[in-house]
C-alpha cells in the first residue's frame, strides 16, 4: 500500500511540473548596429552622399570624430594618430567641394574599380595638418581604412588655380598610395620586366634605365614605388607635357620610359576601362 501511495505522489508531481512549464518564445537574431547612419543631416547634398554609399559601400562623412580619423588596429609609436590631425567640414561648403571632388576624382574611374578600391570611409574635413606644426597643411591623407580630404571650408574658395591643380593631383596620387598600402595595387607583369632594378642608378642614368624619379631609383621596393611614380606623373600631366619632357627622345634615350608608359595606359584601359592619361589631360574641372 505504501508503495502505491508513493507511485501516486510521484505521478502527481510530474503532472504539476509539466503543467507549470512555460513555453519559450522563438529566438530571433538581434539587429546589427550600423556604425554610421546616413543621411547625417538634411542638406541638399545629403542624398548624394547616400547614393555614393549605396554604389560603393563607402561612407562619405562630414560629421566624424578623432577615432574615425586616427583609428588603427595596430599601435605604432609616432604613427598616424600621433602625427596628424584635422577638423570636421564646414557644412556650408560640403556641397560645393563634394561636386568638385566628384568631377575631378570619382568620375575618372569605373564604378567597379571604385567599389573595389575606395576605403571604408572618406572623411570630409578642413585644416588637415601636422600636430607638431599647425602651419604644415595637407589636402589629403590616408590611414588604415580611411581617406581624409581637406578644404571643405572657406579655404576652398581661397585656392588659386594652381592650388586646385595640386589638390587634384594629390587626390589621384594618394588614392593609388592607399591602394598600395592595402596590398591591392595592380601592376602589369610586363611593367616590372622593363627596368633592371638591380642596376645601380645615378643622377645622369636614371632616365635611361626607365625611371621617372631619381629618388625612387635610390630607394628600396623599387618596383612598387616606380609604378606609383608613373601613376603620379601620368595623372598630373597632359600628354603634350609628357611628350615635351620625359617621353622626349633626348630624355628617354633608351626608350624604356615610353615602353613602361604604354604598358600602364593600355593595361588600365583594357582591364579597368580607365584612361589614366585622360585624368592628366583633364587638368582641373570646375
Language-model segments: residues:
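Bacterial N-terminal signal peptides that target proteins for export
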Residues: 1-8
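C-terminal motif of bacterial Sec signal peptides marking the signal peptidase cleavage site
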Residues: 15-19
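Acidic/polar, low-complexity intrinsically disordered N-terminal segments immediately downstream
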Residues: 21-111, 244, 250-286
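Auxiliary, metal-adjacent structural segments of Zn-dependent hydrolase domains
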Residues: 91-145
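Structural recognition of the beta-strand scaffold that forms the well-ordered cores
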Residues: 123, 146-150, 229
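Active-site recognition of the HExxH zinc-binding catalytic motif
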Residues: 147-195
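Metalloprotease/metallohydrolase-associated module, dominated by Zn2+-dependent proteases
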Residues: 195-286
